[in-house]
């Protein structure tokens, strides 16, 4: 993750919150604790703090229009896509944050595939931040988070629920959650999968890396 001088206040604010929660005296004490921690807790906490989690449903909508108008028809007519009589489709949301992107993928696929039962669809959602991965698995979003979605789609793909504070919220329907597998993953470690993906969404994580790192990741995605 590339952290320039323009991110200093962001980093200071996020670590300041952790220091207060741990009732530490300041950054020096926190740094000393990081150096002596052998459990891995410090590293996970640091990664969760500095990974930015800006996301929303149907963010960068052009990508989902491309899925509907180009990707789905291309996969459908590919003979190699059929396995066991079904059309195989695999997608990956790399840097999935709290899951809005991958659930938007699911909704887009269901809205634009006429006979979904004839498809074998599996979506992978990964992120370095363990907290947002857990959020995505739960699939619960505040009314504010879903406010940009068409009411007809909310009714079709969400159930009324409550958030962790007991406030009215929405939860993705079970059939959407079953399409997605959430996993904690560091993009710079070994990837625990070998099968090819038909599409990868990675913009939301790539923008936080410098150019050489971006080029290295693009080559890995391609391979």
What kind of feature is each model-predicted range?
Residues 71, 75, 109-113, 140:
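Active-site catalytic pocket residues across diverse enzymes, especially alpha/beta-hydrolases
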Residues 215-223:
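A short glycine-rich, Lys/Arg-flanked "PGG" loop and its adjoining helix->strand segment in the class I
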Residues 94, 114-201, 205-213:
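Extended basic-aromatic, gly/pro-enriched interface segments that bind polyanionic ligands
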Residues 1-92:
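Conserved AdoMet
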Residues 68, 106-110, 222:
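A structural alpha-helix within SAM-dependent methyltransferase catalytic domains
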Residues 17, 36, 73, 111, ...:
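Active-site micro-motifs of SAM-dependent methyltransferase domains
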Residues 84-104, 118-124:
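Conserved class I S-adenosyl-L-methionine
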